[in-house]
């Protein structure tokens, strides 16, 4: 089940929802949440509920949550909101119009330079026998693997 979280209570219960049997992903019903709470669409105002969903998803061992849709046809606003969602740890965005897809896909895709870094890191890691050298290798390995998976999914090649 894709659990659509649309209220203050839903945000506060996101952890238990993420751990519920059958739930495979959380999504943010941002418009209904704003109506429920009186919150503006401002990035700062929306950071808390988005972050709660990211943390709840992690605790529930789910993929990163899906952000709510952007209303309107302004691609700069859509791009900005998509980039903010990604910066907070969300991994997708609901769409209201098929014309939003290319903008969202570009915003959530890794850059070519990120892909180059990731593949170089992974190649070096393999070349040294998959040995973890220090405490920073594990987080970098996880980041590199995530970037590589996304690059493969989006068909992005390194520089």
Which residues does each predicted region cover?
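Expand to "…catalyze enediolate/carbanion chemistry for C-C bond making/breaking, isomerization
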Residues: 1-159
